[in-house]
A protein has these predicted regions:
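Conserved GNAT acetyl-CoA-binding A-motif
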Residues: 101, 109-120
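Active-site rim helix/loop that mediates acceptor-substrate recognition in acyltransferases
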Residues: 31-52
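A short beta-loop-alpha structural element at the N-terminal edge
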Residues: 5-21
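Conserved active-site alpha-helix within GNAT-family acetyltransferase domains
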Residues: 98, 122-140, 145-146
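Conserved beta-strand in the GNAT
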Residues: 54, 60-69, 86
Length: 148
C-alpha cells in the first residue's frame, strides 16, 4: 500500500463512529468478540487522559492505537500506557503501525510526557520484534490477572 493514501487522526468527542469501527478492527485482528459499548466510547473520547489515534485509507479505519496517560506519584508528570495497537491484516508491515506509534510519541512530547510503555506477550513474536525495531527497551516482567 502506498502510505500517501493513509491519513491519521486523533479522535475526540464527535468521532464515536470512527472509534466504534476501530473496536471492530481490534476484534478482527485480535480474533476476539468484544462488545462495542457506545456509552464507554463516548466517555473515553471525553476523557483527557485517553488518547486514540486512527489510520484511515480513504474513509475506512485500517489501524489504530489507544493509550492512557497515568499520573506518576514518584516523580513529576505522567507516563503513557499503550492499551491496544492494531492494523488491518492486509495493511500490516506497511509502516502504519510505526506511524501510529510515532504520532503517539509526538503527542506525548507535546504534553511533556517523557515515558511510554506497552506490554507484549513473549509468545507474540511479531509484536516483540515490532517494538524492538522501534527502539523499545524490553524488561522481563510477569503480568497477573484477576477475574472479578
Amino acid at each position: 500500500m502506498n502510505n500517501k493514501y493513509v491519513t491519521y487522526k486523533k479522535l475526540q468527542s464527535g468521532n464515536e463512529k470512527d472509534f466504534h469501527d476501530l473496536v471492530l478492527l481490534f476484534n478482527d485482528v485480535f480474533e476476539t468478540e468484544n462488545d462495542v459499548n457506545k456509552e464507554n466510547i463516548r466517555r473515553l473520547l471525553n476523557n483527557p487522559s485517553f488518547v486514540c489515534l486512527v489510520a484511515f485509507h480513504h474513509h475506512e479505519v485500517i489501524g489504530g492505537i489507544t493509550a492512557y496517560e497515568l499520573m506518576s506519584y514518584d516523580k513529576p508528570g505522567s507516563v503513557m500506557y499503550v492499551y491496544d495497537l492494531a492494523v488491518q491484516n492486509i495493511h500490516q508491515r506497511s509502516g502504519i503501525g510505526s506511524r501510529l506509534v510515532s504520532e503517539l510519541l509526538a503527542d506525548c512530547r507535546q504534553k511533556g510526557i517523557k515515558e511510554l510503555f506497552v506490554q507484549a506477550e513473549e509468545a507474540d513474536a511479531h509484536a516483540v520484534q515490532f517494538y524492538q525495531k522501534l527502539g523499545g527497551e524490553s524488561f522481563k516482567t510477569r503480568q497477573f490477572h484477576f477475574n472479578l
